From Swiss-Prot:
GO cellular component terms listed in the entry, alphabetical order: cytoplasm
Single GO biological process annotation from the record: arginyl-tRNA aminoacylation
Entries under InterPro entries matching the protein: aa-tRNA-synth_I_CS (IPR001412), Arg-tRNA-ligase (IPR001278), Arg-tRNA-synth_N (IPR005148), Arg-tRNA-synth_N_sf (IPR036695), ArgRS_core (IPR035684), DALR_anticod-bd (IPR008909), Rossmann-like_a/b/a_fold (IPR014729), tRNAsynth_Ia_anticodon-bd (IPR009080)
Organism: Rickettsia africae (strain ESF-5)
Name of the protein described by the UniProt record: Arginine--tRNA ligase
Gene: argS
Length: 576
């Protein structure tokens, strides 16, 4: 029995019985109180009903208490504050969740929230002009883990990378590769400021020289540009794909910005918005304060972005008449919606925080308020060693590439550590602590818990083979798991799917990492109690019945930790 789901269903039934209202009860929450003094679970149903029916919340809460106290798994109910209903659950109901994890594993870990949602999540979208830096990695991992979580709760999810292969940065890439090509032909070159001086483009010049000889130099500009651009963008994308693959990340779609231009989708989108009355000719307001020299006060085509909450309307054309980057964003959102997405998620870096309102405006307009949009910002990553900031130019190269850091610490450590802070908060990545075997290193602490549970089961199989066979046959008495420490762990295990649902609801993958750290901490504490008091040991040869129950507990911990690590794309370790 999933206690959280069961209580929610019983509250819905009670709401229908007491107030003939099931629909509003669906919006009620079942939460774990921050203070255990307030019981095991808490619901706000009384306050929701009270607001709807214009009744005092405590009066509503008391009526719910009369009905719900009769449920066989409820030990007690208390009314707190303005009308929160706090529930204490009977121990045997918590203990039964261990059996659900072990004997009905597939059903316990299965979550089905809403299969009608078709989510498109765009993340990384780094310019294809060079190796990915570690700042990209945070957004990449956040987006990838969020996609995994959303898939885990049964949403249909498309993972997308928007390839910025149109615009000035691509022109600069082509110019740089052309110079490297000339260099490969024996010409002395100088890379001008503003281009890409990195040595990673040298092999591209060499490949072109080998394939074309000096033929590219005799071609007209347009033909040469087309060849070099196609070649360079594809090679840079291959590099980015490898960087991502090394982090365990694979997108479903790499969508080309250039394709929007080539297929006329930008023109089509602008015409649609004109028919909707959302494009007009006007001037942008002057920046606040003194007049800026860069302010463009010409009459131009503008999108009515302010109608949808943006701070200003947005230009869709540049001064030279070409489409603006914003115009590409309009066409790209339209394309996603036409492909069937009804919820768009954009994962952006800290340097794009100013794009949030304009992207929301785009989707609200093109989705006609029927398509949901969320824009998530990933803040910066600061590298430290034992808490002391590291200058990346001296430590891991000029821009701390993903390859550098991956080589230094490994994929699993990077993935886990990127989730140890909420995405919109800066993250300190300690290059020393992440390799320590101590509780100060969260990924080690969690992996060590997984290894220990396997060690417990192996030890029992070796020392008590008959008892171990009984455990595998499901012959254990879970009522023996009655200590405060055991019940605390069991409650946490039972809340795993609740944590997963919350992570999906609020787009917060860090909740998974926090949960695993908390579970590992409680398990290690109980393990350490066993060093001081033999009654707390998991394998007690003189007490077969208690050992059987604790083997069930250890196995449940192992399965939940493995499930959590799998969700965030980290491979559980079986030995250290």
């Amino acid at each position: 029995m999933n206690i959280f789901n069961q209580l929610k269903q019983d509250i819905i039934v009670a709401s229908r019985q007491l107030y003939n209202n099931q629909e509003i009860a669906n919006t009620a929450t079942i939460e774990i109180p921050k203070d255990s003094f307030n019981g095991d679970l808490s619901s706000n149903i009384a306050m929701i009903i009270a607001a709807k029916e214009s009744i005092a919340p405590r009066e509503v809460a008391l009526k719910f208490k009369e009905v719900l106290i009769t449920l066989p798994y409820i030990a007690s109910i208390e009314i707190a504050g303005p009308g929160f209903i706090n529930f204490t659950i009977k121990a045997d109901s918590w203990q039964a969740s261990i059996k659900d994890i072990l004997q009905h594993e597939e059903k316990f870990f299965e979550i089905d929230i809403d299969k009608s949602k078709n989510i498109n999540i765009e993340y990384v979208s780094a310019n294809p002009t060079g190796p990915m830096h570690i700042g990209h990695a945070r957004g990449a991992i956040y987006g990838d883990v969020l996609a995994r979580i959303l898939q885990k709760v049964s949403y249909s999810v498309t993972k997308e990378y928007y390839v910025n292969d149109a615009g000035s940065q691509i022109n600069d890439l082509v110019s740089t590769v052309l110079l490297r090509y000339k260099e490969a032909l024996g010409e002395q070159i100088t890379i001008p400021a503003g281009l890409y001086p990195g040595e990673y483009l040298i092999p591209l010049g060499q490949i072109l020289a080998k394939e074309y000889g000096n033929k590219l130099l005799t071609m007209n500009y347009a033909e040469r540009f087309k060849i070099i651009k196609s070649f360079a963008v594809e090679k840079m994308l291959d590099l980015n794909r490898k960087d991502l693959a090394d982090l365990g990340i694979k997108h479903d779609i790499f969508f080309s910005e250039q394709s929007l231009h080539d297929k006329g989708e930008i023109e089509e989108t602008v015409k649609l918005l004109e028919r909707m009355g959302l494009i007009y000719e006007g001037t942008l307001p002057a920046p606040k304060g003194k007049i800026h020299e860069e302010w463009d006060n010409r009459v131009q085509k503008l999108f009515k972005s302010t109608k949808y909450g943006d701070s200003q309307d947005r230009p869709i054309e540049k001064a030279d008449g070409s489409w603006s980057y914003f115009a590409s964003d309009l066409a790209y959102a339209k394309d996603k919606i036409e492909r069937g997405a009804n919820h768009l998620i954009y994962v952006l870096g800290a340097d794009h925080s100013g794009y949030v309102k304009r992207i929301e405006a785009i989707v609200k307009a093109l989705g006609k308020e029927q398509v949901k949009v969320d824009v998530k910002i990933c803040q910066l990553v600061n590298f430290v060693e034992n808490g002391v900031p590291v200058k990346m130019s001296k430590r891991l190269g000029s821009f701390a590439s993903v390859q550098d850091v991956n080589h230094e610490v490994g994929k699993d450590i990077i993935r886990f550590m990127m989730l140890t802070r909420q995405n919109d908060k800066p993250l300190d990545f300690d290059l020393v602590k992440v390799k320590e075997q101590s509780r100060e290193n969260p990924i080690f602490y969690v992996q060590y818990a997984h290894v220990r549970t396997i060690s417990i089961l192996s030890k029992a199989k070796e020392l008590m083979p008959e008892s171990y066979n009984n455990f595998e046959s499901g012959k254990y008495d879970l009522s023996l798991l009655s200590s405060e420490e055991e019940i605390e762990i069991i409650k946490l295990l039972a809340s795993w799917t609740k944590t997963l649902e919350a992570s999906a609801k609020y787009f917060e993958p860090h909740r998974i990492a926090f949960y695993l750290i908390n579970l590992a901490s409680k398990f290690h504490s109980m393990w350490n109690f066993g060093k001081e008091n033999s009654d707390y040991r998991f394998v007690i040869e003189s007490n077969k019945e208690l050992t059987l129950a604790r083997l069930a507990l250890a196995s449940a911990i192992q399965k939940v930790i493995a499930s959590g690590l799998e969700v965030i794309g980290v491979e559980p370790m079986n030995k250290m």
